[in-house]
Every structure is written in C-alpha cells, then in structure tokens.
C-alpha cells in the first residue's frame, strides 16, 4: 500500500511517520550529538548536513527509516562533499553549490539559486500560458503570467537568483513575441507606432523579476 507522490495527504503522512526520526536526531546519542550534524526536512524530503558524513551517521538514518517501515529512494539518496569543485546539492527546487569569489579573493561562498529542474518547469508553464492555442487577449495573458511569475519569484527570492530571474525575463519576453506573431499575419505587431516589444509589455504591466 502507499499514497501517490504529490497527493494531498502525502505530506501529512510523511510528517507523522518521520516525526520520531526528527526527535531522535536531536536526542542524546543521535547525530546532532555524536556528529554535530543538522537535519533539514520538508515532508519526505530531507538533508543531513555534517562536516564529516561517516558511516555511523548513514547507518543511523537507515535504522530510523527501517523502524518507520519506510524505504529510502536510492535514486535520490547520496553523500556529497559540497566543498569539492563542481559538487552541488538540489533540494526543494534550489541548487546549493560552493563557488569561487567573483572578486578574486581566495575563498568560496555558498551559492543558492533555482535548480535546473525548477527552471525547466517554469519555462514549460510559460509556454503553456503563451501557446498559440491559448485563446486569451494580451492583457489577460499578461495578468495570468504575472500571477505565476510573482509566486515563483517569492519562492526563489532567497540566495542569489538574479541571473535566473534575468534569464526568465528574457524568456517570457520571447514567448510574448511569438504570442503576438501568432495573432497577426505580419511578423510582428507593435503596440504603438515605434514602440518596442519591451516598452509595450511594460505598459501592459508585465512583471519584471
């Protein structure tokens, strides 16, 4: 038996079954004590952070999962050393990676930004809302796109999302260019005489991240 992934009740069941692990993690004899580790969990997704992820920590987690009669998803289970070049961690739509300082200083900072999968998903949603078969007026389409963009930006505003936001702005503008071309026999349809696509979209209130 089980529940569909993404089901309404799945997060509730995950919190019930994993609550004991949360508590035991911080009790005497748990990884918080013997490895100075930290546990970050959301529903059934969790990350354990420690300076050294030894076999004792891994074994403790496996025992807790077994005790809850759950099974680890081995496709999503891995041990990483984030300070190695190129190593990264994807969690809850974010990518975490230590990058070299852009000013040339001899240290690294923890770069947090939207993951590749999160960007692919928002691109697909923008394609849906600006598709040729999407029968909406330009103002209505912009209003719906704005709602999705605001929600996405509010979620990913933490860390360093500026590059991802800038790229998404360009992607959305290109999608609206195709949106307008599909509604005219001409290759483009300016909003006003001499008005650029960017200024026209801004006048209609398109959100810029």
Features from the language model and the residues they span:
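Non-catalytic terminal/accessory segments
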Residues: 1-209
């Amino acid at each position: 038996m089980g529940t569909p992934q993404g089901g309404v009740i799945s997060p509730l069941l995950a919190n019930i079954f994993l609550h004991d692990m949360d508590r035991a993690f911080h009790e005497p004899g748990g990884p918080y004590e013997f490895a100075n580790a930290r546990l970050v969990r959301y529903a059934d997704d969790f990350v354990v952070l420690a300076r050294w992820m030894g076999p004792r920590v891994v074994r403790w987690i496996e025992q807790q999962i077994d005790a809850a009669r759950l099974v680890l998803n081995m496709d999503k289970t891995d041990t990483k050393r984030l300070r190695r070049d190129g190593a990264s961690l994807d969690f809850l739509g974010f990518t975490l990676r230590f990058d070299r300082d852009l000013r040339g200083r001899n240290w690294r900072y923890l770069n947090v930004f939207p993951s590749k999968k999160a960007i692919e998903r928002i691109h697909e949603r923008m394609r849906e809302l600006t598709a040729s078969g999407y029968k909406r007026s330009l103002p209505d389409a912009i209003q719906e796109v704005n709602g999705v963009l605001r929600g996405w930006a509010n979620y990913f505003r933490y860390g360093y999302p500026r590059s991802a936001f800038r790229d998404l702005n360009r992607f959305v503008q290109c999608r609206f260019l195709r949106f307008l071309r599909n509604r005219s026999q001409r290759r483009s349809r300016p909003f006003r005489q001499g008005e650029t696509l960017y200024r026209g979209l801004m006048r209609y209130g398109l959100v810029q991240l």
